Amino acid sequence: MTLDEAIAKDQELKSKFLTAIAAQVKLDAAAIAKVDVCDLGKWLYGEGERKYKFLKSYKPCADAHATFHQQAGKVVREINGREFADAEAMLADNTAYSKAFGALDAAVKTLKKDAKL
């Protein structure tokens, strides 16, 4: 799996959240908030860490990934608390969630460039 494919999977969380909101179903907040469960996290804390932790762009990327999953966990807590309107509002543009994803996307691009991937 490429880094582009891995970050696309994290981007798909928004659709998953919107589907859960529409269906009014609960999600696994603990799993979504974990940084080492998704494909990008597995790469960052596996092969990526082994090969690229010396790059100055590695830690900011890992930090941005952690921040994104913190925000995703907050959205899921709202969904699971049946605060569907609040959860949906958290997914809008210029929210902490969307800014965290934007920062993650930029950090991954920088790491890819530095690592020549």
Regions from the language model: what does each represent?
Residues 1-117:
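N-terminal membrane-sensor/transducer module of prokaryotic signaling receptors
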